Amino acid sequence: MAVKKYSPITPARRFMTSQDYSQLSKVEPEKSLLQSKSKNGGRNSYGRITVRHHGGGNRQKYRVIDFKRDKDGIKAKVATIEYDPNRTANIALLNYADGEKRYILAPVGLKVGDFVESGESSDIRTGNALPLANIPVGSMIHNIELKPGKGGQMVRAAGNAAQLMAKEGEYAQIRLPSGEVRMVRINCRATLGQIGNIEHENVKIGKAGRKRWMGVRPTVRGVVMNPVDHPHGGGEGKSPIGRPSPVTPWGKPTLGYKTRKKKKKSDKYIVKRRNQK
């Protein structure tokens, strides 16, 4: 989809861009695949803020997405390509031959009227889901499982794709969008192709109000708070943080501090780190 620019009739409009949604299907979402979402403003059951910067925003319904792609051997026709407010990628509504309807993540090149399927014997074509054992080395894939049958957990954001690098024994090696090379069991499923809506990264929000529509509240710097609110707070006038390095509101080191566990069990599946040359 193309990125739209606006005439600078206000300061916010000068740099604001949005996407041209004219290529999406002009239909209401499938009611049987909608679920209600309740907002909690980042509060827990005690009413205390547990996640900062959450609150407000437009009302949304959750679209139930088929990440498992476990309906094997039955072809499905793409009925619509739709906007999903809950994710950066667009979604496609599939009408299966037996009457069932499911949403999937829409890859690049998938159009209304196309047919997709899943299973070991599926064709090597964009939108089809197969075990990694049946996908040719070098293919671009997305919606990758970490455990067989659990459903895709990796590479699900707009414009993303991983590459199947090699197959050795029970594991396949996949290069993720971050550059990390990781081993995944060869009987895990993935979907062929690159996630659509690749222009999403070029959209500029442009104004604070648009972030509020998304349910994102303002972020305040710790150095302008009082000492009771943040370790960086306090002081007379414009003062430094008064520490050797920055910390979070709860006193933990931040900005470059490594937070991954030193001996995480899944480390053995990482062949190459994302920042390794």
From Swiss-Prot:
Q: Which family, according to the similarity comment?
A: Belongs to the universal ribosomal protein uL2 family.
Q: What is this protein called?
A: Large ribosomal subunit protein uL2
Name the domain of life: Bacteria
Record bears the keyword Heme: no
Known function: One of the primary rRNA binding proteins. Required for association of the 30S and 50S subunits to form the 70S ribosome, for tRNA binding and peptide bond formation. It has been suggested to have peptidyltransferase activity; this is somewhat controversial. Makes several contacts with the 16S rRNA in the 70S ribosome.
Pfam families recorded for this chain? Answer: Ribosomal_L2, Ribosomal_L2_C
GO BP, sorted A to Z: cytoplasmic translation
Residues annotated as region Disordered? Answer: 20-54, 223-277
InterPro entries in alphabetical order: NA-bd_OB-fold (IPR012340), Rib_uL2_dom2 (IPR014722), Ribosomal_uL2 (IPR002171), Ribosomal_uL2_bac/org-type (IPR005880), Ribosomal_uL2_C (IPR022669), Ribosomal_uL2_CS (IPR022671), Ribosomal_uL2_dom3 (IPR014726), Ribosomal_uL2_RNA-bd_dom (IPR022666)
- The SS bond pairs are none
